[in-house]
């Protein structure tokens, strides 16, 4: 099988040296992502496209899906690459490939040609289109808005029969821009803002301020791992968790109620800036949108920015909530966000929307900054790829099994799309489907007299969810790894 990768248009208008650098980085990213599917896979770069060739036909759908999620790719063409002799040979091969698709449909033929030939692209379009029209009685040529467009590419003595076109996410390849640190809470905004910076070519590390205990951290780990695994797995990134409960306790005890929200955000920016400086990261990323909550007015945002020299990027600053939720739905983080607890909003009963710098600084004089220094020093930093192993250590009380008993039921916790693409069937045991993002609200509705064996393809999400369910008091869960 063969895929032709078309570059994001903004890459093609760069200078020759920059364009070449971007293409090299994108080629490396594609190799890093796809090596898990087929070790014999070949990735070859050209000036205006990248070729991906693989031998393992069983991985076709997985490879195609992975390519559509790599930043820097505009679209993917799945092609059949065959030699040809003349225009009639092109027609005959096109007839075999497209006959079934054109039955009872209107169509047109579009050809792109590279190399020296004794015919033009239009000549091929007319010849092949006329031949298809004659040999498929129920098909009819229609040059504008046809039901089917037959795409062909001719390159020297090779014919590319385009079997499908699949849109990518666009943007710049990860690694073409500098690293950023995303302040992730697991909600709608931080997930979308992280995705937007990945799409713009940044390697996104994650910094999480834990205000709600182990269950909250597990939930945010899931979001960060999902974003990395889906859009940024070509690069290693850090997940830094800071226990912010001591800081919140100090604020609740010593700070005036109206100033709490702004001061909490200032403390977070201070802490994140120290983490960024420690790891050589150039900027922070937040999901703040202008006017969305009390701390996100222009006055308050300016005061929050003032505590650090580190650049703070806010890709959602002009977005409304509906737009953000729609983006979260598109990238797959909506269901995570809906079940994620929100802690920052309850810290102050009557927050100020127009904080005064002198008042904020006066309140902060009451704060013991050694507490902030200590929580940053004790921050837990892990390679995001190690989240699975770390979870395995944390879920020591959850048994991992490769078989099953008469009272067991396998619980397939993959997303709905994954379940539909590759349904799980295991002989001798019932399989129930419940996506991971619904476990927090729907697991209690299941038969609690059964033992539920959580399963996902790689075992990461099943371990994370097993820990979460154990913390919620469900002891009838195990991890299924056949």
Curated annotation (Swiss-Prot):
The keyword Transferase applies. It holds the Pfam family ThiI_fer. Disulfide bonds join 344-456. One of its GO terms (biological process) is thiamine biosynthetic process. One of its GO terms (cellular component) is cytosol. InterPro entries: Rhodanese-like_dom (IPR001763), Rhodanese-like_dom_sf (IPR036873), Rossmann-like_a/b/a_fold (IPR014729), ThiI_AANH (IPR020536), ThiI_fer (IPR054173), ThiI_N (IPR049961), THII_Thiazole_biosynth_dom (IPR026340), THUMP_dom (IPR004114). The active site is at residue 456. Residues 61-165 form the THUMP domain. Residues 404-482 form the Rhodanese domain. Its main location: cytoplasm. Its EC number is 2.8.1.4. One of its GO terms (molecular function) is ATP binding. Keywords: ATP-binding, Cytoplasm, Disulfide bond, Nucleotide-binding, Redox-active center, RNA-binding, Thiamine biosynthesis, Transferase, tRNA-binding. Catalyzes the ATP-dependent transfer of a sulfur to tRNA to produce 4-thiouridine in position 8 of tRNAs, which functions as a near-UV photosensor. Also catalyzes the transfer of sulfur to the sulfur carrier protein ThiS, forming ThiS-thiocarboxylate. This is a step in the synthesis of thiazole, in the thiamine biosynthesis pathway. The sulfur is donated as persulfide by IscS. This is tRNA sulfurtransferase. The lineage of its organism: Bacteria, Pseudomonadati, Pseudomonadota, Gammaproteobacteria, Enterobacterales. The gene is thiI.
